[in-house]
Amino acid sequence: MPGPIRNYISLRLGSLSYRLSQGYRQNVESNIRIVTGRDSNDAEVRELTRSIFLTNALNFADLLTLAWRSRNWFARGSQVVYGDWAVVDKALKRGKGVIFVSAHVGCFDFIGQSIHAHGYTLTVVTGRTTSRFVFDGVTWLRGRRGTKMVEPTPSGIRHVIRSLRNNECVVLVADRDFFENGHEVEFFGHKTTLPPGAVRIARDTGAAVIPIFTRRTHSGHEVRIMDPMYIEQTRDVQADVAEGMKRLVPVLEEGISSALEQWVMFQRVWPEVAPDSIRIFPTGSPLESPLLERVAQKLPEIRSSDESAPPRRRGTEEIASGDAADV
């Protein structure tokens, strides 16, 4: 099918999806509202949200064709507007591999295909957020050119570590904590959690972390290859991960802000409702009454010896042992 016709159909379907997908539309509006600081009824928020739905439709259409494109096509269709592929070559000379970290911006599938088309041996970590049938179909399309696709499972992470030790490249996206057990950060000025997997694996393997982003243009795709990051390894794992995330988050913010109208994120990145407090008594128990609550408020608070320590978040200690839930 000719490109203009394919794009026309995709845009129509994207516009229809925007009107019909109320839940996803509200999720996108929530994310955009937090990033821009505007109200959800603001015209800019609505326009950015609509643009994201259109971008998503174009991305899916591209996914159906990218696997059959030639290397020359990727060279003609992409323009590196920041950095250079020489940055990757220099990082690989260290012999410890490269972890590309990206976000769901632009045609993010183009990044993996473009990296592979430039001759780099590549593994992409992708988590399943749809039905198994759809996920397997999309995974097959993404890996058709030879890219190795792995899920964030113990075996998948072991493959990632082996790839890095073989001085190969790995791609992870880090703009949403899909498993909700990541590292707490301040993202666009609001607290949330993001997956620390890339930082933790880089710390343990010595691999370079290179953020990379793409943006759609009328003539193709812009690519931004950011400066490499190296995660220091000390005896304090949590401190190393926290410092690495502190350095990575501003780069993610910059990459997303550069193409906010193409940030194809349909889940809420920031939780809007705080989790329920732990109940002392079962729901409906006669012991759970306003009277007893008032009595409890008057009683002195009992503190344990380690109460001042922050709660331990699952995940930042487990990547090396093969737990992939944080990737």
Each language-model region and where it sits:
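Short Gly/charged-rich anion-binding patches and loops
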Residues: 27, 86, 110, 137, ...
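Non-catalytic C-terminal accessory region of glycerolipid acyltransferases
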Residues: 38, 46-50, 92-94, 117, ...
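A conditional alpha-helix N-cap/helix-loop micro-motif detector
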Residues: 78-81, 131, 150-154, 191-192, ...
